[in-house]
């Protein structure tokens, strides 16, 4: 059962060939088997998963409508609010925080989302390796000496190891796509506003987006079908009709225009074999009928520094709410200002403190226009670059990451080296366009992801291209370790 895709498992549960309870029990057993090696979860919810699975089975017995995504156990990144289940954001400052409401993305799963646990993550989603968690690092199921990527590394490890059939992650500057690449999965960042952010604890509000992490593209399409749509509780939620993401998935890429992004394929630090796998994927799409050419995003090289000004600036504002007064950790002290200082000093980790300071500096009087204002101008230029590119191409292609998964501890003390991992991912985040990472091949026995990017709300086309790329790679999901 653990080898099935989420789509296949849903088919079998709905056909009453297996029960949701059996699926939940299998996931729980797998968590118990490998969690000691991986540390995929901050909070396990095995009993809750069994209770909810039993209710799904009862609804099926009564002949009630049960949608495919309601049948499949899921791992949930610990940045999404779950009513009555602690939600830590990987931080000590929220160690005992239990939300009183559920994130809208989880409400999409009906009354009984079969959640196997809250997945580990970099603290407040700030990181590229899941080493910044206050609850210990997560290890990559492909090689336990390596990172799974971040910040959604726990979600990626859980899916790769079969601790759940799929997972919800969040992507601010690559945090779904990069761990998907490192763990041999499909990771989709939808168009900004396609999925409600209500109940998502904010990192950078103009960038954060919830996305699927799955075993294959068909599962990603099914999970997006579940969570996409307008939500009046989220002012940034787009009132754009949700299409059927599965209907055209197998149509192929005949006539599709695919542009290879020169600046990202040739970016500094991109390993030769990673570059070759991306170009090989482009050739495979061309052989399948796509029209492939080269395209330029002239300002893509400025995306990384712009991102690391804009995102910390939003962090500085968003994390001001953690003061020990309303919720979360409170460290006693003489006087309210000393209590603020001690609470934040003890509650936040080093990377979070670093980004708060960077953001506060960028927003300070005398520096706002020189840093934040200029970064926003770069963001506008990148949006214009994509607009020009999509006038001639339907899908753009690049590596997802410059390298394969690196070793635990290798970059954790070198912030600039860690940030450089995001060089291929941040342009799509700054523009708010959809982007997906699909397995393209192996380098040194480790998975390499290829990134495809589409125009706003073009997820059906993007998923169709990703499905063709996935099939061309010849790779098939296998449980690790």
Curated annotation (Swiss-Prot):
Cellular component terms per the entry's GO annotation: glutamyl-tRNA(Gln) amidotransferase complex
Write down the PROSITE patterns for this protein, in alphabetical order: AMIDASES
Keywords carried by this UniProt record: ATP-binding, Ligase, Nucleotide-binding, Protein biosynthesis
Determine if Ligase is one of this entry's keywords: yes
The UniProt record lists the EC number as 6.3.5.7
Family classification = Belongs to the amidase family. GatA subfamily.
Question: HAMAP family, from UniProt?
Answer: GatA (MF_00120)
Subunit info here reads: Heterotrimer of A, B and C subunits.
General function of this protein = Allows the formation of correctly charged Gln-tRNA(Gln) through the transamidation of misacylated Glu-tRNA(Gln) in organisms which lack glutaminyl-tRNA synthetase. The reaction takes place in the presence of glutamine and ATP through an activated gamma-phospho-Glu-tRNA(Gln).
* Name under which the protein is recorded: Glutamyl-tRNA(Gln) amidotransferase subunit A
Gene that produces this protein: gatA
